Amino acid sequence: MLNIRPSTRKQAKIKLALQGCAGSGKTYSALLLAYGMTSDWSKIAVIDSENGSADLYAHLGTYNVVSLGGDYSPENYIEAITLCENAGMEVIIVDSISQCWDYLLDFHAGLQGNSFANWAKVTPRQNAFVQKILQSPAHIICTMRTKQDYVLNEKNGKLVPEKVGLKAMQRDGMDYEFTVVLDIDLKHHVQASKDRTGLFMGRPEFTITPKVGQAILNWCNLNPQQTIVQPQTSQTYGNSTPAPSC
């Protein structure tokens, strides 16, 4: 039976995507965001599909790592997220979800018969993975690789080719599933391409530090007695040290 009720704001769990080309600092930036949200490295887990890259930043703190071991099927990702949830992780970093889409494209390419009809064997698996992310009781940060191209920029009177990120390597429209999508470039500058929190859209580019994660957590925990704490709008949040490449 249908009913109508007043709108209410419940405590939210952020579903955030960080997208950029190789070397833009996605893993490192995700860890800084996660620490800003928890202030406790032991409550952070990284689901690693990047051949051990999650361990490169162990000097930051003792966070947890789940290696996918070369199995990038949606079912293995789902199992890894469930493992982290059962272990009481507050923030789960899925690094990256592009490998899952690559796996599904390869799976589809190997199917016999009508190519269009064969998507019926792929889409439910992708949808189950997306729903696992959206319905998780933990904060989820997903990284996505972007396709790369080169543009010519002028430096000291000369045209120099620079690598730029284009479309994310995931299913079309995947960005619609997230509350926030942050685009990060090779200089580790970040801008929001989607933002339902009101924290980032229309603001200058910035560099991620834990203070960004703190601002996101404040938004998630908003109740009628609280007000949103807007993050700083200068180029950096707190510590201006840029993220290393990852």
Residue ranges and their predicted role:
Residues 9-11, 39, 133:
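Generic structural signal for beta-strand residues in well-ordered domains
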Residues 17, 91-93, 141-142:
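Structural motif
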Residues 22, 70, 122-123, 145, ...:
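Glycine-rich anion-binding surface patch
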Residues 21, 40-131:
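Conserved inter-motif catalytic segment of the P-loop NTP-binding fold
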Residues 21, 127, 131-215:
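Phosphate-binding/switch region of NTP-binding enzymes
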Residues 1-20, 24-26, 35, 45, ...:
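Interfaces that engage single-stranded nucleic acids at replication/repair/recombination sites
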